[in-house]
Regions:
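Classical Sec-dependent N-terminal signal peptides that target proteins to the secretory pathway
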Residues: 2-20
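Zinc-dependent metalloendopeptidases
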Residues: 19-168
């Protein structure tokens, strides 16, 4: 089975952003999508009160619901979230989307965190459900971290329009 990997990172920098033409992550087959709106998650080295509020918040602004993943569900697509401690680079978090057979369907997502900052976690989890970077420096989805970034109205519209399940 061939796997295609897409990596997205949030970096601390004051360099100008590369502008993104589309609001959703794409590969050569189209927009990356989940086959179901019910997603499973598992996390390591996070406390429940550090991660669950972010997951519940995403449920309120998207079409997705989240349930805790169990080892017996190995074949079920899921999001794995890992805190890896601090990094020597400026990378705060990284999301790796995996799709099999070169299709635009997500099998698994791996979120690697180098900080426990809630905004960075939200940014990376939104990549995990399919949202790309924004070219708006005020947006939480802007690829470079700065003070006072929020989810903009356009971000919220894009999040609600991420296709999943029967909406694909």
């Amino acid at each position: 089975m061939k796997l295609k990997i897409t990596i997205l990172s949030l970096v601390i920098s004051f360099l100008p952003s590369i502008s993104f033409a589309d609001a959703y992550i794409e590969n050569k087959h189209g927009k990356i999508t989940w086959r179901d709106c019910k997603l499973f998650y598992v996390y390591d080295d996070y406390k429940k009160d550090e991660i669950i509020p972010t997951i519940r918040y995403i449920e309120t602004i998207s079409n997705f619901t989240f349930r805790k993943w169990k080892k017996s569900m190995k074949k079920q697509p899921h999001i794995e979230i890992y805190y890896l401690g601090s990094s020597d680079s400026n990378v705060l978090g990284r999301t790796t989307l995996m799709d099999s057979h070169n299709k635009a369907r997500i099998n698994n997502v791996y979120v690697s965190m180098f900080t426990k900052d809630q905004d960075v976690l939200l940014h990376e989890l939104l990549h995990g459900i399919g949202l790309a970077h924004s070219d708006d420096p005020n947006s939480l989805m802007y690829p470079y971290d700065s003070e006072n970034q929020v989810l903009t109205e356009q971000d919220l519209i894009n999040i609600r329009n991420i296709p999943c399940g029967s909406k694909v």
